[in-house]
Amino acid sequence: MAERSRVAVLISGRGSNMAALIYAARADDCVYEVALVSGDKPDAHGLEVARAEGITVEPMDARALGPDFWPRLQHALESAGIDLIALAGFMRIIPDNFLGKWEGRIVNIHPSLLPRHKGLKTHEACLAAGDKVTGATVHLVSPDLDSGEILGQLEVAVLPNDTPGTLAERVLIAEHQIYPHVVSQYLGRTRDFDWITGRVGEIALALAETSFQTSHGSPGWKVGSKSSSKFFAIMWNRHHGEETVGLLVKCSGQDEMAQLIEAEPELYFRPAYYGPSDWIGIKLDRPRVDWDHVAEWLQRSWLAMAPPRLTKLMRVSNEF
């Protein structure tokens, strides 16, 4: 099985959504594991539940720590090799500098169909508005409260005799269903060939005089004029016994290829048929892909294959 993404769950109370994420992760085909549970209250009941389920727990007291809380939390997350943070009843506003370090990697569950009824007392607001349907929303966390990109929603009917309490009970059931599903879906995209290809394409096509073209059925990118263009990047989709989604780029030769593969076999591979021509493979269907590193390889491969008129301009521009 491919390496699972590592999720940290942050809580402030009982952690029922945390528990849903933990139990869903026990399925054989789940793409994530809950690697850490923490929060802002050391006596939160959810910490006891997580500890009993064998999850690493990092109790923290935000009031006692004051301004040191966020740096300490950052250290705990980095030490645990966390890929994604899932907020589950975490009742603390996250500062912008912390959000910046985790952009696109913090998700939250909210008990309404956003953008309706942001903030607290959502069920009271729903009933006061006369809504016939409400639900749960999973979204990315952004600086603006409950305004990040919506990743998934699940509707819940509002009954004529509902109270905020009865409605909250049913919405919570919906939360427990949708949160693990959307987290798996969101993290699973990093193993999806089309998503990875799209990400590579954005970087490749930002380089000068590049174009998309297939190579023996595989997506690729060329540099140069139409009549004399050359491939500088080709996608690899689990071909010839190498069960990985990867990117083929040009390296300096067989010696460098052998050294890189020996030093980091989890990152590099020698692609069948392409390897003898100095194409090296970079594995991309794994957690924690360094896309800046991918961009560096694409630029390097572009320089190796681009015509002199383009490489000269690139080198001159890099001097300024």
Regions found by a protein language model. Name each.
Residues 45-64:
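Conserved nucleotide-sugar phosphate-binding/catalytic loop shared by glycosyltransferases and other
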Residues 191-320:
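Charge-dense, helix-prone N-terminal extensions
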Residues 24, 32, 84, 88-191:
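Donor/substrate-binding cores of folate-linked one-carbon enzymes
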Residues 1-45, 49:
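N-terminal Rossmann-like dinucleotide-binding module
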Residues 58-109, 114, 229, 250:
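Helix-adjacent hinge/juxtasegments
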Residues 44, 66-71, 120, 254:
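Structural motif corresponding to alpha-helix initiation and N-cap regions
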Residues 6-8, 33-36, 82-85, 243-247:
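Short active-site oxyanion
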